[in-house]
Amino acid sequence: MSFGTRISRALRFLEIPVKNRASVNFLRNPDLQPIKSVNQTWGFWSNFAYWGVLSFNVGMWIGGSSALTVGLSYSETIGAFIIADLLTILFALANSCPGYDWKVGFTLAQRFVFGIYGSALGIIIRILMSIVYYGSNAWLGGLCVNMILDSWSHHYLHLPNTLSSKVAMTTKELIGFIIFHILTAFCYFMKPYHMNYILIWSCVGTFFAMLGMVIYLTKSAHGVGDLFTSTHSTVTGSKKAWAWVYTISYWYGSVSPGCTNQSDFSRFGSSNCAIWTGTIVALLIPATLIPVFGIIGASACEKLYGQTFWMPMDIFDNWLTTNYSAGARAATFFCGFCFVMSQISYTISNCGFASGMDLAGLLPKYVDIKRGAIFAACVSWACLPWNFYNSSSTFLTVMSSFGVVMTPIITVMICDNFLIRKRQYSVTNAFVLKGEYYFTKGVNWRAIVAWVCGMAPGLPGIAWEVNNDYFHNTGIINFFYGDSFFSFLISFFVYWGLCLLFPFKITVKHDDKDYYGAFTDEEARKKGMVPYSEISEEEIRAYTLGECFTSGHEYKPESSDDELPELTKTSSENTKVFEIVHQKDNEKESSTSSEKQIA
């Protein structure tokens, strides 16, 4: 057997298991197709819980500690958080439209805007962000697992550390980290749209656990403590104004990856109202309330124990260490269980499934959502997440810098959706190499330029934040502080301007038929599409199972910036690009296709 044959067999073995191999190629697999209408079941509480787990977790509880390093008082920090939450709501809702309008995820939304090949840029960046967040959340989840184990065994509570002092973690922390990864991995055997019940119940349990902690601490301390009321701002004048701007950018930057791939989960929504109300309530109330809980808890702990415990796990560890009673053990177990559930929910929704969807879009022939999520879990170890929490300033840098890279991507997507395409996209064209979204050799260079222009000015600020001795240019530093605002404006107007100066033709506004069963009959007709129920089984099979890949023709669009070759036969089944519509539809479209350019 030749070496080439062995490689070919190995690659074929690695392909994702599907009933019809023709349904998988380098542009598509079943996980990338629009969600069927029967699976669009996320109502208000499901959408609330998706964003709610962002707040009802340990990371949000300790969020106030990181933000306070910029010099604002507690009340000013909370005010900045509220403004940042409003900004996040606007970005999240605006970027949810492709998912709700066309029931597609982040991968196809990237192809719509950045091009078939250019979409890899945003997908790779989002994967890297997900992996970093995965490691961070898994580390906190491991600490929560240890809460449960501590309540079970006094010996485990005092388990000696056998690791080297050079490693920034203990044996207990490593055990909890491993157990949390194992628990989380089981969740990836279910479909993403079935995880909403886990999200809902984890939010409910964690809210009452945190509320109980605050009530107990404030009652024991006979108030919220002096730290909460006596802390004042340490900056004045313009420095104070920029501290406000920075805190807003930091708080937004910590959740911007979730805004970027909002379409991954808005496509599960049962109605636009459910998505909007669930998102607004979750990002406005819990996202403001839980950091306040954390600040009150730290203030009360300082009065009670002489220390400002920011980590909830440290509070329970102190209780068990000083009094290993039945009451302390019960409280630790139930709160630990709720915290573990919240960390699992947040990790699988915002990191695991998200990275799985992204990896499926990057290598659809070999990766599905389950494989991608498990891969991200394994690679997250390389981030050394235990180092994130050595100091709040280090973690603040990691969190806030994400917005520098992600905000321009979000901005370009919003501009393209509302001003350029007018919320009209063709899903079937996203599975065609040289189709509507081929642009220039597969890349929409306008979007790339806008992204670079919005991102580049903020990069020196990240370097300065890591080491303040690099330079002392006030303008660069202040730009970094307000990057979430400035990069949005730059990317938005650069992309809009480039589309006006160098317009591309829009020849296919949307699909003429609902090939994937993503809409009810009424919804399909409102969009000007033939309902799924009125399409022949042969045509549905051709589009959903990929049999149209074997049609042997390559679709030649009029929208490409390049001069494409004539229609040709292709030899390999796995590299064949399926025909957008039947030949008669192509003839009809070519005769009536609009030559309208973007203006």
From Swiss-Prot:
Induction remark: Induced by limited extracellular thiamine levels.
Any GO BP annotation: thiamine transport
Keyword list, A-Z: Membrane, Phosphoprotein, Transmembrane, Transmembrane helix, Transport
GO MF assignments: 5-amino-1-ribofuranosylimidazole-4-carboxamide transmembrane transporter activity; nucleobase transmembrane transporter activity
Residue positions where Phosphoserine is found in the record: S560, S572
InterPro entries documented for this protein: NCS1, Pur-cyt_permease, Uracil/uridine/allantoin_perm
Compartments reported by the entry: Membrane
Segments of this protein annotated with the region Disordered: 553-599
Cellular component GO terms held in the UniProt record: cell periphery; fungal-type vacuole; plasma membrane
Family: Belongs to the purine-cytosine permease (2.A.39) family.
Name the record gives this protein: Thiamine transporter THI72
Native organism: Saccharomyces cerevisiae (strain ATCC 204508 / S288c)
